[in-house]
Structures are given as structure tokens and as C-alpha cells.
Amino acid sequence: MASWGLLVAGASFTAFRGLHWGLQLLPTPKSVRDRWMWRNIFVSLIHSLLSGVGALVGLWQFPQMVTDPINDHPPWARVLVAVSVGYFAADGVDMLWNQTLAQAWDLLCHHLAVVSCLSTAVVSGHYVGFSMVSLLLELNSICLHLRKLLLLSHKAPSLAFRVSSWASLATLVLFRLLPLGWMSLWLSRQHYQLSLALVLLCVAGLVTVGSISISTGIRILTKDILQSQPYPFILMHKETKTREPVARNTSTLSLKGSRYLYSTAAAALGGHLMVLASPKRCMTPSVLGLQERRLEPGKVAHADNASTWE
């Protein structure tokens, strides 16, 4: 049975890695800039739908997996846990292949803890019910992944994004914090039925997943709910494609002496160039015209505005 469970996990790993590769051949939304991240989150959404809904239906139909999370479970529940092991391993490889360790260390720690705990149930055939309860967390991940896809598609200031943010917070409490609390309570009461190594492994997994879950909830609450304008768009410069502020050409010409006349320029333009002279500053009509074109209706130009976002 152990080899059979590992075979299912290996097949799941291959399938999800193939899905990562296959999505590269399909187009992504035009508004998405980080295409790899969008594909990665999309694959994660597929797994969350499969495992989260499967765990909810399984626990609803077989509540004995909650009353006896060590031994009592239907055979297909072990298959679902093995599929999740393959997914988390495939997702970890995908992150290592496309990101640096500094960028993905937190999720890699999460995946390592989850794979270690779930693979114990797959290999031993025990604690499958406990693992099924942990897969309820994927119901919250569905909302988190949808929110992330909207964010990557630059749909943050929208009704759909705000609904996904509220849904993420609600499901985080219902399907993430409550299951984690139940698992912690069960482990504290039934730890004598487990070996010391397994207890330490479960504690490490609960602490890792719990801390990441709490930090995620705080981040969504502060950025999406409490802020009036979450994730404002920063339009990029059309040519440089960077997020650096583009300086406006509002500089003036300082005159140190008395009045200066641009006789040479006036003669070249046939005497049609109006010269603005000042003891301190002088600005040509072309610069003034550039300012007027960039100003929005109803706003007043200030000479002190040196830069803006374009």
C-alpha cells in the first residue's frame, strides 16, 4: 500500500509539472506582466478546487474521519492526500526553477512542512482523516488564488477584487484558522498515541502554516479592506517600460543679469517668437505649451512640480 500511495503521488507530480509546462503554450491575459506567476497561481487554483472540495465532500459523507482521524477513512481519501503531495512537490520545483531562494523561501518552508506531514499519511496509511481536515485549508486558498489572479491582471480597484478580498478573510477564519485550531487541540489531547518524532513534525507544520495564515490575513485586512484605494496602478512609461518617475521638463532659465533678449532665435523664426524676460526666470512659449497640454482640466500649474508618474 505504501508503494501504491507513492505511485499516485508521483503521477500527480508529473501531471502538475506537465500542466505548468503546458500552460506556457497558451496565451495569458494581455494585462498580465508576470506570466509565470499567473500560470503558477492558475495551477494552484486547480489543485485547491480539487483538494478543497474533495476534502469537504469527503468529511461530510464520512464524518468518522473526524471522530477517528488516525485509522478510519475510505480508500479514495488516501488517494486525494497523495495527489496533494504530488502537487506541493511540483509547485515547489516550479518555484525553485523560476524564482530565487530569497523570493520563495516562505512558501518553500510551507510546502516542505505540508509534504512531510501528508506523505506520512500516504506511506503509513494512518492519519488520513487528520490530513483530510488539513486539506480544508485549500477552500480558503481558492479565494486567495482568485484574488491573486485579479491582482496580477490589474483588476485590483474593482468589485470582483473587493469581493475576493472579503471572501478570503471569511474563508480564512472558517476553513483555515478553525481547522488549524481543531488540529492543534486534537494533537494536544491525543499526542500520547503518536511517536515523539511525529508530534514534533505536526507541531512544526502547524506553527509554519499557522504563522503564514495569520500574516496573510493581516496583509489582506490592512491593504485591501482598511485602505481606501488598495494597490493603485502605476502606469509605466511607454518607451522605457519602467516604474521610475519621469521628470517633467518644467525647468526655467535663470538670468543673472538684467533683461536678456533672444535676438538670434527671434530672427530665425522670422520675428514671430515672443520673448519672455525676467530678472529671475524666463520660460519660452514651447515650454509653456508643454505644461498646458499635460495639465488636467481645472488644475493650476505650479513651477515647483518637478516630477510626476506617467
UniProtKB/Swiss-Prot annotation:
Topological type in the membrane: Multi-pass membrane protein
Locations listed in the record: Cell membrane
One matching Pfam family: TRAM_LAG1_CLN8
Domain of life: Eukaryota
UniProt keyword terms in alphabetical order: Cell membrane, Membrane, Transmembrane, Transmembrane helix
Ranges of residues in domain TLC: 33-227
A single BP term in Gene Ontology: regulation of membrane lipid distribution
InterPro entries cross-referenced by the UniProt entry: TLC-dom (IPR006634), TLCD (IPR050846)
Disulfide bonds: none
Chief location: membrane
One Gene Ontology cellular component annotation held by this UniProt entry: plasma membrane
Annotated transmembrane regions: 6-26, 40-60, 79-99, 117-137, 167-187, 194-214
Similarity annotation: Belongs to the TLCD family.
Function, as annotated: Regulates the composition and fluidity of the plasma membrane. Inhibits the incorporation of membrane-fluidizing phospholipids containing omega-3 long-chain polyunsaturated fatty acids (LCPUFA) and thereby promotes membrane rigidity. Does not appear to have any effect on LCPUFA synthesis.
The name this protein goes by in its record: TLC domain-containing protein 2
